[in-house]
Amino acid sequence: QPLLTANGYNVNTVDITSEDIPADTDVVVIPAPKTDYLEEDIKKVSDFLNNGGNLGKQLLYIASYGQEDTPNLDEFLSEYGLSVGKGVICESDSGKYYNSPCITVASTVSDNFTQDVSTEKPAILSALCRPVNTLFDEQDMVSTDAYLKSSDSAYTANVDISQTTGQVNIGDALVKGQQNYMAVGSKAKFTDDNKTLYSNVIAVGSEGMLSDTYLQYSQYQNSEYFISVINGLTGKTAGITITPKTITGNVFDITQQQKTVLKWTFCLGVPVVVLIVGIVIWARRKNK
């Protein structure tokens, strides 16, 4: 929250089950819902992105490995050529993970919308990240692009976290090979005056990448990168990026107590930072 406030962002929260998304909203964020959206909730989000046929809206969908099955959200994401896979992304090469095979850094970062990132090769840290798959490259005015990728030595696996020790137990590999941490699905429309309008769905596989903890690590560019992507998609003019107080040193020299803290951070969820421009709605679904 301090990061976004310092950079001129505003955040509002909407209960998607009982409220409509205001018409002047630019970005909607769905932050790691633990239960599925109802069909009427999905319609509100879909109508927001269609914007009466004018497009020009953005959605940031944040998945979580602790989610229940979400068939309605899955069907919605598929309309933008995206799906969130089973398990979490792990690395088999010890040189590509830290402390645990499921705490990794993206090996490939797309050049798209990195205009506000201070380094040519940003390092994006992630933990317990579900794979974000692209269903096609281009189809019926919808195109997809993977923005953050793992190395070829990655794989996905189910994990089990001990509620007492925080120990992460990794199961057998489900899918081997390069995985996506984040992908974007874009719906396009051509206007009569030869302009192209877009609405975009940005799907991220883990709330950990946007947690306050990871945004503060000076060794990684999570905060710069995600602000830069949202700025680029919405057309926000870049300014001086103000980052929160940073944490330096070796992130992964941690005690058992700190491991337990990380367990709660990634197992039960953390306050998710919402990247927004203009008026942004943080769409939550009330559990009933």
Question: Can you name each region flagged by the protein language model?
Answer:
Residues 1-238:
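Acidic, S/T/G-rich, low-cysteine, solvent-exposed domains in lumenal/extracellular/periplasmic regions
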Residues 199, 266-270:
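C-terminal target-recognition/interaction regions appended to catalytic cores
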Residues 209, 216, 241-266:
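Short, aromatic-rich amphipathic segments at membrane interfaces
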Residues 237-241, 273:
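Residue-level signal for secondary-structure boundary elements
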Residues 272-284:
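Alpha-helical transmembrane segments
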Residues 286-288:
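Short, charged juxtamembrane terminal tails flanking transmembrane helices
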